[in-house]
Amino acid sequence: MAIDLRPFIPFGRGALSQATDPFRAAVEFTLMPMLITNPHLPDNPIVFANPAFLKLTGYEADEVMGRNCRFLQGHGTDPAHVRAIKSAIAAEKPIDIDIINYKKSGEAFWNRLHISPVHNANGRLQHFVSSQLDVTLELSRLVELEKERKTLSIETARSKDQLDYIVEVANIGFWTREFYSGKMTCSAECRRIYGFTPDEPVHFDTILDLVVLEDRMTVVQKAHQAVTGEPYSIEYRIVTRLGETRWLETRAKALTGENPLVLGIVQDVTERKKAEANKALVSREIAHRFKNSMAMVQSIANQTLRNTYDPEQANRLFSERLRALSQAHDMLLKENWAGATIQQICATALAPFNSTFANRIHMSGPHLLVSDRVTVALSLAFYELATNAVKYGALSNEKGVINITWAIMEDKGEKKFHMRWAESRGPEVMQPARRGFGQRLLHSVLAEELKAKCDVEFAASGLLIDVLAPITPEVFPGMGHNVPEQRIA
């Protein structure tokens, strides 16, 4: 039904207060700011403004009556909003719009404006009625929220980029799995780790088929436990489609609910597992070498104390022999405990004597690498034999010499290692009542380690020791078949 406002149009503020119509009184005294304009007058001027409007804008009634509403606009008003209002008025259609208006004080505010055309019973336009509502606080809060949303969006994007970078650098793949269906989504790194193509659909069974049989049941059990919502971690092996065995570590947790979703990461830890295995191997090897070293020290101590009755002499001999043992170990450390060549062993063990007898100690032979245990035994033996040579043998006079030679020779159709310690031009030697430490090393340790035959001759020309041993990979690691045969003269 059209509203007939003609009875109060000629009146300004207060005109409605004299009316008895409750509707008219409500328009004047409502707390909602309201205006009525007359489109039949030039420039569609204001013909009614209620007290709520005057209070909102700060104007007096006589300052607004007869003026077009555009006086509320200012430099901050969006021209697009103004055009939208003009179009609605021209089309005699209602409009709802938020627009920046200005109070008499110059203060800007967001005005939630509603304009409706009022027609008479014949459908002819009579007036426009508008209501205003100051929504500055609301829209300001919305603006702040939008700023916060944009800031949060930027931070979220930045965090995602950082996470993607970290995941890429750390070579971590991530995946999700629908618990009941087994369908999975996988990141690019996850697909690379498992060997899947970029577009290949992935199912939990697809991954399970790659897991080695020994680990498969454990993987299945852990996957089923995920429905509890407790996080789990597991290491297992897969065999890729290229036939490579890889160690993987998976950490996951399920988002519980009607349709649980398992979220997880996977990382290739093959190199770490290799390092752990190598570490364990090294630890066992260190323990083994330590045990051997202690056994050697104990043997040196027993041999020294058993055959030396003077405490000071025993202490000196024991210290010298430990020093020789230490030099042998230093040599092995430089070679990463891979053994040493006989040339290196001779040079190291006889280094203390070379400064005095350099021109009287000669060594020759092919490049032959021997094991670490043989290295230690030979080092101690050479040191002891040289010490005895200084005391009683070829190095105890001015003319004696020592020749140390080694070679590969043929013996009864088998290649063997032959080493000789030959002293000459020294004083005449006689077989002692008991064997010295050096000879005992040659007979016990070398004979045991090399499976060697050791002959000792106290010739008139000097001490002569011949060692003949089979060629075995345990004693001669990396021994090639191209070492030329050479017979020691």
Swiss-Prot record:
Species: Brucella melitensis biotype 1 (strain ATCC 23456 / CCUG 17765 / NCTC 10094 / 16M)
Residue ranges of every copy of the PAS domain listed in the record: 19-93
Pfam families, A to Z: HWE_HK, PAS_3, PAS_9
Keywords recorded for this protein, A-Z: ATP-binding, Chromophore, Flavoprotein, FMN, Kinase, Nucleotide-binding, Phosphoprotein, Photoreceptor protein, Receptor, Repeat, Sensory transduction, Transferase, Virulence
Chain's role: Photosensitive kinase that is involved in increased bacterial virulence upon exposure to light. Once ejected from an infected animal host, sunlight acts as an environmental signal that increases the virulence of the bacterium, preparing it for infection of the next host. This photoreceptor protein is directly related to the bacterium's survival and replication within host macrophages.
Post-translational modification: FMN binds covalently to cysteine after exposure to blue light and this bond is spontaneously broken in the dark. However, this protein presents an adduct state that is extremely and unusually stable and does not decay measurably in 2h.
A single MF term (Gene Ontology): photoreceptor activity
Region (HWE histidine kinase domain): 285-367
Broad EC category: transferase
Database matches in PANTHER family: HISTIDINE KINASE (PTHR41523:SF7), TWO-COMPONENT SYSTEM SENSOR PROTEIN (PTHR41523)
Induction: Induced after invasion of host macrophages.
Residue positions where Phosphohistidine is found in the record: 288
EC number, as in UniProt: 2.7.13.3
The protein, known as: Blue-light-activated histidine kinase
Catalyzed reactions per annotation: ATP + protein L-histidine = ADP + protein N-phospho-L-histidine
